[in-house]
Regions:
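Short, composition-biased motifs enriched in small/polar/acidic residues
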Residues: 3-24, 292-295, 301-302, 312-411
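Glycine-centered signal
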Residues: 3-5, 115, 119
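Structural signature of tandem-repeat unit edges
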Residues: 15, 27-44, 55-70, 80-93, ...
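Hydrophobic residues on conserved beta-strands that form the core of alpha/beta folds
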Residues: 22, 43-46
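Consensus positions within tandem repeat domains that build extended binding/scaffold surfaces
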Residues: 48-49, 72-77, 95-101, 118-123, ...
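Intrinsically disordered, low-complexity coil segments
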Residues: 51-58, 344-347
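BRCT (BRCA1 C-terminal) domain core and associated BRCT-interaction motifs
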Residues: 305-307
């Protein structure tokens, strides 16, 4: 327990549960230890007592006891000289702007008791170099580490579900792994100009607007199959991006999503994509080929605006004309045949099972079937030479088998 004189330097209010909240401090500013109890009552909350450094410009260190469960709104906001913080092991919530603009704070340990961290909690802590969000944290507010320009390493706990603009302007951050607990990232890493590597977890469904805008060091990105939408400006200005893999569940690519990705040379659009926004690939100056695996998505004449290239589409897919997105179109041929996984002719018929073969003009194709993959006994059913873009095949004997598998090959 602190001496009586030291405790008298704090002002408290009594909470409904007979605990105390610190509301004011009048003592010397250098290093402060907040009492755990006073007059037999536990101190459980800190409410803006040091915020905006009102009379506390020299506060360099603070110890928060284990009795405290809540660090309130702007509790230490703009304590510019603060270099050391010890957070007690009972804190469950860190409020909005709690340590914002503590520009001398080099590191902070967030205990495993914390479950919620508010918006802008560590915004503009420009000396902060590392940060770890523990697995106990389920909710983080937007802009949590925004403008932490020295932050080079961050660990995101496995219970976080949403990341908003939490790392915007973290210009020293070089790599990040987004855990599988996260379902949405929205504007999270905008202007992280040193970010060279990112791993997106397999539960993310939305890569929101501006998420990786101006990440000019990012060279490759794999968007997992869990993602259904890529927002506007999501990768705008990623000038070093040379390779992007778009997952097979993406249905929409937003306006200007890959604008000014000046080192991107080709892109493959999966058959799940139904819409591409205006200028999605505007000024991708090295992009000369776009490969489409499915039917023609909706998109205006500006999709590839400003550059020259060709949009290639798979034979047998629908909706294509002689131009798409401002580019001429052409059939996409491959040296080996392929069974189209969607579109016309796939599935049971009145007298068998049918599918369409594509990508193998003017070469012979053998269709084989197997009733049991365990024994691997593949039997030839037909040999055809594709004289056009596609060939329709129907197995009239498929109804004689409880299950049947198919493959095609060139003899």
């Amino acid at each position: 327990m602190l001496p009586v004189v030291a405790q008298a330097q704090f002002t408290f209010i009594t909470n409904a549960d007979n605990t105390l909240t610190v509301t004011h401090y009048t003592g010397p500013p250098w290093t402060v230890t907040i009492p755990a109890t006073t007059n037999g009552m536990f101190v459980t909350s800190i409410d803006g007592v040091f915020g905006n450094s009102s009379g506390k410009p020299g506060l360099t260190g603070v110890t928060i006891p284990d009795s405290v469960t809540n660090i309130g709104f702007a509790a230490f906001n703009s304590c510019y000289s603060l270099t050391n913080v010890t957070i007690g092991n009972s804190v469950t919530s860190i409020g909005e702007f709690a340590f914002g603009y503590c520009t001398s704070l080099p590191n902070v340990t967030i205990p495993n008791s914390v479950t919620s961290i508010g918006q802008n909690a560590f915004e503009n802590c420009t000396s902060l170099t590392t940060a770890a969000i523990p697995d106990s944290v389920t909710n983080i507010g937007g802009a949590m580490f925004q403008l932490c320009s020295s932050l080079a390493s961050v660990t995101i706990g496995n219970s976080v579900t949403t990341i908003e603009s939490d790392f915007t302007g973290c210009t020293s951050l070089t790599n990040v792994t987004i855990p599988d607990s996260v379902t949405s990232i929205d504007g999270a890493f905008e202007n992280c100009i040193s970010l060279a590597s990112v791993t997106i977890g397999n539960s993310v469904t939305n890569v929101g607007d501006y998420t990786f805008q101006s990440c000019s060091s990012l060279t490759t990105v794999a968007i997992p199959d869990s993602v259904t939408s890529i927002g506007s400006y999501a990768f705008n200005g990623c000038s070093d991006l040379t390779n992007v893999t778009i997952g097979n569940s993406v249905t929409s690519i937003g306006n200007w999503a890959f604008r000014y990705c000046t080192n991107l040379t080709n892109v493959t659009i999966p058959n799940s994509v139904t819409s591409i926004g205006s200028a999605a690939f505007f000024r991708c100056t090295r992009l000369t080929k776009a490969f489409f695996l499915g039917n023609a998505p909706s998109g205006d004449t500006t999709v590839f605006n400003g550059e020259s290239g060709t949009a290639y589409y798979v034979p047998g897919t629908l909706g294509w004309t002689n131009r798409f997105g401002g580019w001429p179109t052409a059939l996409w041929y491959q040296p080996t045949p392929k069974i189209l996984g969607s579109g016309y002719g796939l599935g049971a018929t009145s007298n068998g099972f049918a599918f369409t073969i594509s990508w193998a003009t003017n070469i012979p194709v053998v269709v084989e079937a197997c009733a049991d993959l365990a024994n691997g006994n593949w039997c030839p059913l037909a040999t055809n030479t594709l004289t056009s873009d596609t060939n329709y095949f129907n197995d009239s004997n498929s109804t004689n088998y409880p299950s049947r598998f198919y493959r095609i090959r060139s003899p």
